[in-house]
């Protein structure tokens, strides 16, 4: 976001406004942390903010301050539509294009007459009236911190804002272990802790609250793990039947793909999850070094994200998707073999 846009937005938000804050479909820790962090900040500034998420988010994020005040577009449609239609501006957080909210909500947003403000760290964003896009940032939550800073309001940080932003940074950096984590990230984290983010409690709420069913599902996933050493690749599959047998709920597959990436010598990991409701195979990719799963997902699986973490989908069956994936591994063999951690 350039200085001119900051000044324009500061002027626009100088008086109380009705603001809607939107995260992407299937919200993760960064999306929920960013939307709720911005919600608390705008509320302290005297605005009337409303968070609208497209659908359900994981149970391990329900503790976040303000989460009970969010609207779900999929089953609180009338309230969501009313908030959107009455708003003076809509903030789009942690996604780069309107289709990332799902078809129904996208149709509503495309009819919106006022301005959008985008804050996001994914590649190739669409154009909106106000843009704060930085693909070098580890998370949208860190960008919300810097946005508050740019607005001259860093002194307004409190425990609610700090806890939300800490959560998103922690989850999107794999607990600060990914290459996107910088010294600046740690400085931001330190400031959030100084302003009330209880790091031990947040970590426990997110990572130490697994249901028995989730652990059983993890066991099933690890049992399905396949390693292809000739391609430095590992992948996991989960069918709808396997999910149902282990009492699957949204969020149970979060982070499982990282187990495949943790195998010694692996530079590309994937998880393929059957979703009968959407009639697709949902895919998460992770990589090490120079192999860009963002380009790979964009080109072959109608997805994208970051160079070392991205998502995609397939309209083929599980078996057909795996055949396609393995054929692509052969096509990308040289790149995979020579990928390295720089």
Which ranges hold each PLM region?
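Short glycine-rich anion-binding loops that position phosphate/pyrophosphate groups of nucleotides
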Residues: 26-27, 95-98, 122-124, 240-241
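Short, conserved loop/helix-junction motifs that constitute active-site signature segments
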Residues: 83-85, 107-114
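Glycine-rich phosphate-binding loops that contact phosphosugars or nucleotide phosphates
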Residues: 89-105, 117, 124
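Short alpha-helices
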Residues: 119-188
């Amino acid at each position: 976001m350039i200085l001119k846009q900051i000044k324009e937005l500061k002027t626009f938000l100088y008086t109380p406004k009705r603001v809607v804050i939107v995260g992407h479909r299937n919200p993760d820790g960064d999306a929920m942390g960013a939307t709720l962090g911005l919600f608390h900040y705008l509320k302290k500034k005297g605005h009337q903010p409303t968070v609208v998420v497209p659908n359900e988010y994981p149970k391990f994020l329900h503790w976040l301050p303000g989460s009970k005040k969010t609207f779900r577009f999929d089953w609180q449609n009338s309230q969501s539509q009313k908030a959107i239609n009455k708003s003076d501006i809509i903030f789009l957080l942690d996604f780069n294009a309107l289709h990332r909210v799902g078809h129904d909500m996208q149709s509503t947003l495309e009819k919106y007459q006022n301005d959008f403000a985008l804050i996001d760290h994914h590649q190739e964003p669409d154009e909106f009236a106000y843009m704060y896009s930085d693909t070098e940032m580890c998370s949208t939550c860190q960008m919300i911190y810097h946005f508050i800073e740019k607005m001259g309001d860093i002194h307004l940080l409190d425990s609610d804002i700090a806890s939300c932003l800490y959560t998103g940074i922690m989850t999107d950096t794999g607990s600060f272990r990914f290459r996107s984590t910088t010294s600046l990230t740690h400085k931001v984290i330190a400031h959030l802790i100084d302003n009330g983010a209880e790091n031990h409690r947040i970590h426990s709420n997110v990572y130490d609250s697994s249901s028995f069913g989730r652990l059983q599902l993890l066991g099933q996933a690890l049992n399905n793990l396949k390693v292809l050493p000739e391609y430095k690749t590992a992948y996991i599959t989960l069918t709808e039947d396997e999910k149902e047998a282990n009492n699957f709920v949204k969020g149970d597959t979060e982070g499982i793909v990282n187990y495949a990436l943790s195998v010694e010598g692996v530079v590309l990991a994937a998880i393929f999850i059957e979703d009968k409701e959407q009639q697709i195979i949902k895919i998460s990719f992770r990589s090490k070094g120079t192999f860009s799963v963002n380009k790979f997902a964009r080109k072959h699986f109608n997805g994208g994200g970051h160079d070392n973490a991205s998502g995609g989908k397939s309209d083929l069956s599980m078996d057909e998707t795996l055949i396609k994936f393995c054929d692509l591994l052969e096509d990308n063999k040289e790149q995979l073999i020579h990928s390295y951690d720089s």
